[in-house]
């Protein structure tokens, strides 16, 4: 297949290229005129960036849009006339005629549409766990608290966190932020995106809308609090769930999640083993642990903690799996995807280097 990655030099675009490496697909890298004719090195591969145009994508089977919502709104429908478009922005997620897909959860609902939306990172991570639990016990309500890494705001935000952390001397010395409302270093900020009229942020409402759409539960009770935390990569989430059916056997819950695709059970708290951004970074699966009955809902409720790499499972990997679905690729096509090994030989972390571009 011939594939275009538009916005190839952003955080999600680079991760997309990492997934496409060694797949045998012909990949076109596209970005704005500012980046055109420059080279982009991703792993051992080097790409020449072309200036984006609809005409340059016309011969592509798949176009990944790793760009802003405004860009996607303008060009997504035009590109869909000749290619299958997988959009990573929020531009089309809430359009009734555009599918919002998490393939392991609702892939069977795909009906051949040419424009497909990829969900918000926090939603995609949560849905990997919520999907199998809903299928077994029937979700009644979901309360989500997210702990979101700096990279969710893009590569410049990662760089800002690294620089602010290095320069940190004491609290109240510097509360300024460029990519955040405040200094994120050694701080947490209970704001991700702009505030809506109901007091929730746009990010929080995205989770509400997207859980309902993907699970096909338009009346599902959902409440979210999204918090930016000073980690570089991988989001974490605390979930409080209420079910229609009783969940008496926690062992059965753990076995259900252990055997669910894209889920890694990490639930041995007595050995200090539980989900963390430190361990879920670069991992394809979503970690889930701290599974316990909720003290308010009893056997009808569960509390748990999850963590997932929002650039992979929360964005690029889900988009890749959408491509597999729409192209009807065989199961063996996913066998070549492995969790990338973080570098061990270089003293500077991969994350810090990624933050500096």
PLM segments and residue spans:
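Helix-loop-beta segment of a Rossmann-like dinucleotide-binding subdomain
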Residues: 110-117, 187-198, 302-306
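A glycine-rich, Thr/Ser-enriched phosphate-binding loop motif common to dinucleotide/cofactor-binding enzymes
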Residues: 116-125, 199-208, 314-318
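Short glycine-rich, acidic/polar surface loops and turns
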Residues: 272-279, 283-293
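Short aromatic/hydrophobic contact patches that present stacked aromatics
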Residues: 64, 238-240, 303-305
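Glycine-rich phosphate/pyrophosphate-binding beta-alpha loops
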Residues: 228-230, 309-313
